[in-house]
């Protein structure tokens, strides 16, 4: 359960980083 939770959280964080990256790229352009 805890492992699954941490894995899910990690995935969400990674997705958030990617979204932030895309957002910053859009702002730069």
Swiss-Prot record:
Keywords: Disulfide bond, Secreted, Toxin. Its main location: secreted. It comes from the Eukaryota. Expressed by the venom gland. One of its GO terms (cellular component) is extracellular region. GO terms for biological process: defense response. The keyword Disulfide bond applies. One of its GO terms (molecular function) is toxin activity. Contains 8 disulfide bonds. It is found in: Secreted. Signal peptide: none annotated. Belongs to the CRISP family. Not toxic when administered to crickets at doses up to 5 nmol/g. This is Cysteine-rich venom protein 25-A. It comes from Naja haje haje (Egyptian cobra).
């Amino acid at each position: 359960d805890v492992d699954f939770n941490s894995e899910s959280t990690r995935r969400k964080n990674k997705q958030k980083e990617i979204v932030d990256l895309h957002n910053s790229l859009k702002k730069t352009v």
